[in-house]
Amino acid sequence: MLVDGCLACSVLTGKVQAPGGVIYEDNYWVVEHSLSPVLLPGYLIIKLKRHCENLAELTLEEASTLGSIIQNTCLALSQVVKPAKIHVCSWGEQVKHIHFHVIPRSSAMPVGNLKLLIYLQIKKLLNQLGLGKWVSDAETAEISQKLKQHLKMTI
């Protein structure tokens, strides 16, 4: 079941498209790049293919495949983007549909969860003011394609 007005559901139905398209999907989960405008190359979103807002409501099958999806996504990101660290998190406040942010932190970015979140918010604000640069859809699509190829070989 998908829900009207849910951003994640809109992406799943194709009403909104992530640059580079679907990187990986199985019966329960989809991996795509974050939506435009793109803040960081390789900033991925893993989302459940049905609308669900509570991890406790995952089916046994959905829950049992999540770990391998996260691990394989991080492995591909490690080899393609080569970040210093990969952060995986889920807030579910603005977009309640279960999804996980997979954030590659380069060595030039601050270490620490709170510092990283503040850095990303400042970077976004500077980009919105025209004082920074968004990642182009072409670069995002190229990274997505490399990640897709890597995941095809490993899963």
Language-model region placement:
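HIT superfamily nucleotide-processing domains
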Residues: 1-155
